[in-house]
């Protein structure tokens, strides 16, 4: 069991590192954020299955719902930005402009 948590913690850490390092493209940032959320989902699923408590079962489902919403909003933002600017470079975006 500790190796599972170690692997999930490493997956979360590598996704966080990828988010911090590869900030030039919006697509790579969104993929790293999705990796962070999915590793968090798996970690809470394993924890809730090991605790044998019915009160902790809805937490992974809630995280999965938020991950689906995050993916949908991220894809909509990516399509809008790539259609408007022709690229997905984050440094070219100025979200304060109208």
From Swiss-Prot:
Highest rank taxon of the organism: Eukaryota
Topological type in the membrane: Multi-pass membrane protein
Pfam families in alphabetical order: Oxidored_q2 (PF00420)
Principal location class: mitochondrion
GO terms for cellular component: mitochondrial inner membrane; mitochondrion; respiratory chain complex I
Cell compartment(s), UniProt: Mitochondrion inner membrane
Membrane spanning stretches: 2-22, 26-46, 58-79
GO MF terms held by the record: NADH dehydrogenase (ubiquinone) activity
Gene3D superfamilies, per database record: 1.10.287.3510
EC number: 7.1.1.2
InterPro entries (alphabetical): NADH_UbQ_OxRdtase_chain4L/K, NUOK/Mnh_C1-like
Catalytic activity: a ubiquinone + NADH + 5 H(+)(in) = a ubiquinol + NAD(+) + 4 H(+)(out)
GO biological process: aerobic respiration; ATP synthesis coupled electron transport; proton motive force-driven mitochondrial ATP synthesis
UniProt keyword annotations, A-Z: Electron transport, Membrane, Mitochondrion, Mitochondrion inner membrane, NAD, Respiratory chain, Translocase, Transmembrane, Transmembrane helix, Transport, Ubiquinone
Self-association state and partner proteins as the record states: Core subunit of respiratory chain NADH dehydrogenase (Complex I) which is composed of 45 different subunits.
Family: Belongs to the complex I subunit 4L family.
Known function: Core subunit of the mitochondrial membrane respiratory chain NADH dehydrogenase (Complex I) which catalyzes electron transfer from NADH through the respiratory chain, using ubiquinone as an electron acceptor. Part of the enzyme membrane arm which is embedded in the lipid bilayer and involved in proton translocation.
PANTHER family linked: NADH-UBIQUINONE OXIDOREDUCTASE CHAIN 4L (PTHR11434:SF0), NADH-UBIQUINONE OXIDOREDUCTASE SUBUNIT ND4L (PTHR11434)
Name of this chain's protein: NADH-ubiquinone oxidoreductase chain 4L
Organism: Mus musculus
Lineage: Eukaryota, Metazoa, Chordata, Craniata, Vertebrata
Encoding gene per record: Mtnd4l
């Amino acid at each position: 069991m500790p190796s599972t948590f170690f692997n999930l913690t490493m997956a979360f850490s590598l996704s966080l590192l990828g988010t911090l390092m590869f900030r030039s493209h919006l697509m790579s940032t969104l993929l790293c954020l999705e990796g962070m959320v999915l590793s968090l989902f798996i970690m809470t699923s394993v924890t809730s299955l090991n605790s044998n408590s019915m009160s902790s079962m809805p937490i992974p489902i809630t995280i999965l719902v938020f991950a689906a919403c995050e993916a949908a909003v991220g894809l909509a933002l990516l399509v809008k930005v790539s259609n408007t600017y022709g690229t997905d470079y984050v440094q070219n975006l100025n979200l304060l402009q109208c």
